[in-house]
């Protein structure tokens, strides 16, 4: 078996920072600090290989491990001049800490002051001349060992401790006496015996039990949950770091604390942190005492109280940051005015701090732009783009669903789009529905947030909300709506229309009442790092947008064009929907043409507004795609209004609606099939688009950059048929206006057959745009609106590694995309390639699109900054 124990300390180290995989983060950091000659407590690291062996061999150690451990302790005794378990001279006490290869703060176990018993406690008191300190250390050991190794509930120790303080009329820990500590220790021992039938006094037995406890903690519930949430492998295992104890609880010249080399909240370049005098590390973490700042303008700071130690800590912090070239999180102890560094690691930080620090370090010439970009978590930019809940206030949610669209919103509950529109004039509203449909668009538009009982991360509500930049929570199966009573039920809680709730689209949590919110910020540093991303990336980022507001937001966030304009979204405007319904219900082509002619000028103005804002940036307009039933009324009141407006009997409306019913409309009469069977619809749209282009050119001297896209192709014959229709209309308009139009023609590749037939299809078009939402649906045979009913189980059982509608399935859907690219390029070398599904805003999927040599991705406006960073990171990682 490989070497299991690596030494570190004042005499150097067996390891270094590059050995993270076997020494863990903490052990590698201690080894590196030893090599930098920094003051650290001497010790050794037991490698992650022991953890893996332990779990593979029925929780047993390798044969020679105990001998190696005793040799390591002997070496530590020589180095420190202290004896482990000594009852006559200065005894060696140990700390035993976990150390995963990936930082998992607070998830695994630690034992301090190990090696204590009655005789060792007396020897320690004699050696330092401080019995109160020795007893305090013994008390701490019994509590930590009892709760960690023996699984005694920690609150039982806390109760004993607090009861003794109350009986002695003592309220501050600093006033505790030797006599009181002796009573507390006696009760702690009795608690050990009650749970374990014995008191473990042998230091080596304590050490072996502590090592096992740390190994067991690798698979405790909180560690398992943390790894799942953060995608950390179970196979890494944990290292164990064993060090001589240094004591921050020796009196007024001793302390413990945590320091950051820069502010983890803002990134400001100054030492930031807290410390406690006469304390050990768990006192800061537990919150039982209020720590003091390291730097402050008053006498309670370390800078004022311990100026020499503060100066040394500042120098070490600077040295560590310059060595690791990143902000550091440093744990330290001060023993009788001597500073010891216990740990350094890359510090966690907010999104704004990450950006500010990255920009600062480039300007300080510590790192390159590429390194700066790799420091940014693309998803963390959601913090900058959306309002979020201030969780520091300690809040309790009433329910939880899927985090479908980030941001937080507070408002009164409404149950219909009509009520949302009516009440939004005077209140912020949260639209609560079983699910949403395109008909709800106006209600969604005026709502501050959207909550649906059904649906997943790519449901209609989720997709539209992300496009609008509105918070949305979907799939809240622990909520129910009683539509007759107009109430929302969460367990025993009944929420009526008009009651206030808060939703968090970033976590999926729902709260009763108004929660404290933090407003978003977008700094100059944020803009600068996004500019660096654009300099580096080869993959362009466009927006999915069809309104002027969408387009303006997209430009603000750096979109290089519109990659998907869903023209049908324009039809849901309240001024247009009656005409659209009239066109659909019309019993003959003459009446349909009449309705289309009324729609024509309205569509023309829509397109003019979009082209005007985009100013010659590419605008990719998809012709009408969804099935027509989505535009039709669902309530009796709306059906009556439609009948009256068309001067038709209500029975005929019902008859037409029944005739248009489809069992599976998403695979039915939609997309290019509509354009072929009802060519007058596409002809109206084409006339509106090209008329808008001509009028902007002639009247406003604005040139447009049109890309025209045909949806849901499965057969090259469909392209040929629609291409003929399109060019007939364009040629007629060119003659009418005496103007030559310039545009490119493309198609969506969103059906497996289209991907397989792409060689033929590519000959007829200028570009492909991969519609990965429908391509995923039709490849898997899974409805994105219904996946929420089984996805959690599939993820838990590892049937799916991730939600295929969030992260692109590279093996199945990805292979179809690669086939389409290869075959398409073989017949059309100049074929341009884009992607416009929800995956186009997902960093992992963007890495795939970069590798596949796409020209652009197109995502919802509020995903654009995330996509820009992810595109640059993909280029940096893949080196091309």
Swiss-Prot record:
Residues 504-538 are annotated as: Linker 2. Substrate binds at residues 566, 622, 750, 771-774. It comes from the Bacteria. Mg(2+) binds at residues 750, 774. InterPro entries: ATP_grasp_subdomain_1, PEP-util_enz_mobile_dom, PEP_util_AS, PEP_util_C, PEP_util_CS, Phosphohistidine_dom_sf, PPDK_AMP/ATP-bd, Pyruvate_phosphate_dikinase. The active site is at 460 (tele-phosphohistidine intermediate), 836 (proton donor). Its cofactor is Mg(2+). This is Pyruvate, phosphate dikinase. The lineage of its organism: Bacteria, Pseudomonadati, Pseudomonadota, Alphaproteobacteria, Rickettsiales.
């Amino acid at each position: 078996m490989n070497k299991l124990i690596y030494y570190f300390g004042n005499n150097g180290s067996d390891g270094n920072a590059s050995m993270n995989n076997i020494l863990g983060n903490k052990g590698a950091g201690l080894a590196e600090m030893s090599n930098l000659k920094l003051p650290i407590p001497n010790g050794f690291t037991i490698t992650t290989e022991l953890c893996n062996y332990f779990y593979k061999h029925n929780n047993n150690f390798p044969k020679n491990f105990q001998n190696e451990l005793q040799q390591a302790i002997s070496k530590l005794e020589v180095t420190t001049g202290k004896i482990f378990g000594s009852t006559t001279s200065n005894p060696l006490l140990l700390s035993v800490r976990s150390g995963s290869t990936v930082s998992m703060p607070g998830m695994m176990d630690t034992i301090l002051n190990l090696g204590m018993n009655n005789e060792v406690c007396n020897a320690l008191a004699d050696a330092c001349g401080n019995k109160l300190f020795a007893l305090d250390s013994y008390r701490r050991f019994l509590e930590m060992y009892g709760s960690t190794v023996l699984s005694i509930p920690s609150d039982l120790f806390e109760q004993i401790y607090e009861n003794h303080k109350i009986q002695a009329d003592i309220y501050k820990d600093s006033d505790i006496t030797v006599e009181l500590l002796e009573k507390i220790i006696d009760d702690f021992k009795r608690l050990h015996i009650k749970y374990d039938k014995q008191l473990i006094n042998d230091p080596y037995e304590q050490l072996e039990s502590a090592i096992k406890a740390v190994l067991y903690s690798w698979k405790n519930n909180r560690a398992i949950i943390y790894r799942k949430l953060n995608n950390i492998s179970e196979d890494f295992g944990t290292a164990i770091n064993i060090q001589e104890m240094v004591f921050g609880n020796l009196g007024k010249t001793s302390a413990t604390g945590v320091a950051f080399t820069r502010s983890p909240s803002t990134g400001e370049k100054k030492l930031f942190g807290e410390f406690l005098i006469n304390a050990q590390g768990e006192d800061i973490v537990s919150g039982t005492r209020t720590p003091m700042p390291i730097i402050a303008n008053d006498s309670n700071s370390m800078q004022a109280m311990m100026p020499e130690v503060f100066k040394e800590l500042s120098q070490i912090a600077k040295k560590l940051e310059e060595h690791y070239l990143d902000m550091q999180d440093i744990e330290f102890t001060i023993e009788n005015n001597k500073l010891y560094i216990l740990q350094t690691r890359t510090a966690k930080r907010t999104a704004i701090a990450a950006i500010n620090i990255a920009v600062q370090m480039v300007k300080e010439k510590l790192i390159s732009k590429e390194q700066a970009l790799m420091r940014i978590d693309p998803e963390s930019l959601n913090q900058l783009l959306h309002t979020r809940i201030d969780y520091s206030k300690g809040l309790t949610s009433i329910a939880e669903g899927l985090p479908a669209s980030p941001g937080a919103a507070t408002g009164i509950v409404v149950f219909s789009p009509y009520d949302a529109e009516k009440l939004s004039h005077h209140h912020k509203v949260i639209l609560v529905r079983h699910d949403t449909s395109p008909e709800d668009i106006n209600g969604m538009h005026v709502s501050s947030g959207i909550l649906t009982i059904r649906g997943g991360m790519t449901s209609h509500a989720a997709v539209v909300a992300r496009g609008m930049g509105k918070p949305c929570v979907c799939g809240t199966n622990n909520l129910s709506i009683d539509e007759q009573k107009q109430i929302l039920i969460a367990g025993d809680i009944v929420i009526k229309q008009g009651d206030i709730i808060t939703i968090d689209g970033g976590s999926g949590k729902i709260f009763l009442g108004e929660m404290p919110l933090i407003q978003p910020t977008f700094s100059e540093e944020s803009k600068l790092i996004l500019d660096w991303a654009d300099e580096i990336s080869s993959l362009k980022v466009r927006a999915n947008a069809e309104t002027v507001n969408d387009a303006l937001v997209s430009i603000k966030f750096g979109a290089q064009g519109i990659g998907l304009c869903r023209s049908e979204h324009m039809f849901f405007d309240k001024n247009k929907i009656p005409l659209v319904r009239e066109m659909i219900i019309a019993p003959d082509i003459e009446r349909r043409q009449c309705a289309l002619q009324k729609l024509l000028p309205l569509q023309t103005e829509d397109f003019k507004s979009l082209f005007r804002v985009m100013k010659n940036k590419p605008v990719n307009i998809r012709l009408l795609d969804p099935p027509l039933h989505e535009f039709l009324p669902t309530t009796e009141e709306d059906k009556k209004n439609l009948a009256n407006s068309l001067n038709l009997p209500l029975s005929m409306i019902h008859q037409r609606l029944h005739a248009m019913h489809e069992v599976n409309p998403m695979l039915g009469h939609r997309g290019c099939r509509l354009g072929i069977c009802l060519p007058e619809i596409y002809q109206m749209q084409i006339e509106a688009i090209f008329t808008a282009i001509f009028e902007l050119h002639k009247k406003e001297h604005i040139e447009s950059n049109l890309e025209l896209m045909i949806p849901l192709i499965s057969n090259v014959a469909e392209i040929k048929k629609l291409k003929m229709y399109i060019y007939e209309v364009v040629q007629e308009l060119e003659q009418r206006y005496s103007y030559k139009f310039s545009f490119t023609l493309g198609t969506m590749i969103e059906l497996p057959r289209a991907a397989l037939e792409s060689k033929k299809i590519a000959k007829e078009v200028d570009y492909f745009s991969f519609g990965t939402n429908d391509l995923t649906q039709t490849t898997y045979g899974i409805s994105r609106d219904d996946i929420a009913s089984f996805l959690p189980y599939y993820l838990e059982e590892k049937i799916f590694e991730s939600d295929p509608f969030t992260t692109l399935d590279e093996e199945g859907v990805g292979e179809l995309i690669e086939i389409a690219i290869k075959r398409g390029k073989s017949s059309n070398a100049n074929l341009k390639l884009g992607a416009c599904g929800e995956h186009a805003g997902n960093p992992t999927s963007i890495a795939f699109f970069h590798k596949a040599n796409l020209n652009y991705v197109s995502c919802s406006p509020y995903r654009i900054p995330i996509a820009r960073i992810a595109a640059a990171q993909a280029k940096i990682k893949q080196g091309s």
